[in-house]
Amino acid sequence: MYRAGVTLLVVAVVSFGRWDSVTVATTIRVGWWYEPQVKMAYIYEHNDTNLTIFCNTTAYDSPFLASGMMIVLPHRTQFLTRKVNYSEDMENIKQNYTHQLTHMLTGEPGTYVNGSVTCWGSNGTFGAGTFIVRSMVNKTAGNTNTFIHFVEDSELVENPAYFRRSDHRAFMIVILTQVVFVVFIINASFIWSWTFRRHKR
């Protein structure tokens, strides 16, 4: 029994290392593990009082898509809106999903300047983007037009810690699930072979 226990431990450790690399490869190749793509835009009009946020999230070949947006200000964090779509048979049916989320916030002039907006999507892994709201007041005399601003990749900042932790946690859950499955198979095989040998005697 002692020998079997040592063997099991070694195999489990090796399997963990193997699944670590295999899981990374799988997340790159399996269709619904591609993280959702997030595109964002906003309008900050009427002397920086009305902030309208646009968030488009797209997931390809996925069993579901859950999207949402939030804003972080110096003294509060506010979840703004969310949306979920999924196929009737998530195990076998994969679809392409696009969510177009829009939300308008109204406050005192300058309330949302320098606030950070995060839009995200999840189809089994996270795709998220965060940008900083900038003033859109046009100082030119007589020019009152405010245009939509499409957020470029160069304007993205680091996502809130929640999303970084969630990405790591989801990845580790996949790895640990694989390890538990491998250990279960090894145990089952050992028990079966030991029982078979005992009956054979």
Curated annotation (Swiss-Prot):
The chain crosses the membrane at residues 171-191. Residues 1-25 form the signal peptide. Residues 26-170 are extracellular. GO terms for cellular component: host cell membrane; membrane. It is a single-pass membrane protein. It is found in: Host membrane. Glycans are attached at N47, N50, N56, N85, N96, N114, N123, N138. Keywords: Glycoprotein, Host membrane, Membrane, Signal, Transmembrane, Transmembrane helix. The keyword Coiled coil does not apply. Residues 192-201 are cytoplasmic. Belongs to the HHV-5 UL120 protein family. This is Membrane protein UL120. It comes from Human cytomegalovirus (strain Merlin) (HHV-5).
